Amino acid sequence: MATKDTGGGQQKATRSTEEVEEQAQDAQASEDLKERQEKLSDDVDSVLDEIDDVLEENAEDFVRSFVQKGGE
């Protein structure tokens, strides 16, 4: 019986180690996702700023391109 208790204790230690490793991997994955989200957010903001600049310069042309002409 003493052998089984020791084996169970070692198994518990292994499970704890595995749980710690999983938590570390989850934390790293979470950080990677945050970095990726920030980069994508910056990219989207950059594109939107560029669109705003173009619209400010060419607003009239932009609107005309969407106005239907007779029969279209």
From Swiss-Prot:
Q: Where is the composition biased (Basic and acidic residues)?
A: 31-42
Q: How does it assemble?
A: Strongly interacts with the proteasome-associated ATPase ARC through a hydrophobic interface; the interacting region of Pup lies in its C-terminal half. There is one Pup binding site per ARC hexamer ring.
Instruction: Enumerate the HAMAP family for this protein.
Output: Pup
What does UniProt say about this protein's domains? The N-terminal unstructured half of Pup provides a signal required to initiate unfolding and degradation by the proteasome but is not needed for pupylation, while the C-terminal helical half of Pup interacts with ARC to target proteins to the proteasome.
Which protein family is named in the record? Belongs to the prokaryotic ubiquitin-like protein family.
Q: Per its database record, what is this protein's job?
A: Protein modifier that is covalently attached to lysine residues of substrate proteins, thereby targeting them for proteasomal degradation. The tagging system is termed pupylation.
Mind telling me what this protein is named? Prokaryotic ubiquitin-like protein Pup
